[in-house]
Amino acid sequence: MHRFTLPCAVQHFRLFPLSLGEIVSQQRVQELHLSLTQGRWQHLKWGYPFQEAPPGAHLWAWFAPDTLSVSSAWKNLTNALSGQLCASLNFVDDTVTVSPKRSFQPQGWVRSANSSLLRYAALPRESVCTENLTPWKKLLPCSSKAGLATLLHALQLFTANYMSLALDLKTVCQDEDCVHATLELQMSVSLVFDTVAAQNGYQTWSLSKLFGAGIKTSCPLSSMSTIYVDISNNGSVGTYRLSPEPTQLVVSGEGAHKRSLAIYDLKHHVAQGRLNLAAQYEKPHIFWLIPEPPLHITRYIQGYGLERGGIVNRIQNNNPTKAVRVVLLDIIPWFLRVYLHTLKISSGPRQLKAEHVSYQPGRDRERPHHLELTLILPPAAETIVAYEFERAFLKWTEYPPDANHGFYIGSAVLSALLDEPVANYSGDISVCPSLRHWLTIVEAKKGSGGLLQRLASKAKGLFRKSSSESSGCGDSSDQDKKNK
């Protein structure tokens, strides 16, 4: 992950990418979140990811209140980003774009949080390849010539079980009154490798085995270049030895949220030669139970034939005593004509009612259906949200080129406020005080299509999850709220 900032009132592009800075400046963008992902994150197997992203392309942005035409700025933004990252974002138009009312709240400071300034779209069919990776790496201060970015070889990355590239841009206040603010750009890549299959049943791994090479140099422009290895389970579910020895060991947190981290200062280690961080396990792979997430959602299409069908969202609240208030956002393509009167919300034999319903019907070839529900999920129970639809007749030119894929449907987005942080996720470094200066708010996202939890120093977090059905429902998600 790389993070660098640009003062809002100063055109300083020594580290901040000039091309991206010009795009957000010309289009009056206050906040931007973009991800390009290949594969699906298996949350029940891998826990919660550090940076959530659904398959395909996923984009949402907040615009300044003085923007003359948000719709025009959004179109110009998607076209510019399409050229910037060699992606098909130019296919983002009114038929896949919505302005959510209660979802996707700004993560940073914005002058106005009016939902009319927000635009959200997803292209679950978008494929990711080296044409996207190369321009993404060029946005880094040292490109792929030095530092951690030298590990990003396309051959190794695209053979991973999961690969995601992300750009997150937001405005950060430097004082309480926000007189001084900066633009913060966070670039992250998320990868999942199956080391057990690659190493004949052993979990043993190293940088050279995963990425094809070690690290020879650090980026001279970076103020800090560090590798963190979570060793919390070392000795409990399997014993392994790290080599070389870490620069520092940190233990923080309490109870179920206690974490142990091995910290490697890249600048220190590369001065002594090439760094090939490795973990050598004593025994073959050991399987253990993964705790259930506090909220879990699955989503699928039901019915048969080519005329009618339905979409079912099954939301599981695993809290044994507390009900949870959530916001469910669902964007349905215009070619699926939704019958709102068929909407059913149930938990076991009980029929539930939504606290708030916001629905904008779609128009053929003009806009999608936009449904937002505020729900109270009973404790230790599964809540089912289902509705029916009718497929529209399409022109022969409107069918996708590959009939084997069929039509993709963007995933639902589930938002909730949790009282406590969750133990079962991959991205927990908020418990380590020495890391808070590096990342003050930690993201850990989870879901059948994606779930987000934001953890501040206090035990509060925003939990967001999206789910989807491959071949019937594509996978996309995302919303963040800032914790005080």
Q: Where are the regions a protein language model picked out?
A:
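Short aromatic-acidic-glycine turn motif
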Residues: P333-T342, Q351-K353
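Extracellular adhesion/glycan-binding regions together with long Ser/Thr-
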Residues: R350-E390
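Short, hydrophobic/aromatic-enriched beta-strand segments in well-ordered soluble domains
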Residues: L277-Y281, R299-Q302, L328, T383-F393
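Extended, low-complexity intrinsically disordered regions enriched in serine/proline/glycine/threonine
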Residues: M1-E292
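Short beta-strand elements of extracellular/lumenal beta-sandwich folds
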Residues: G303-I332
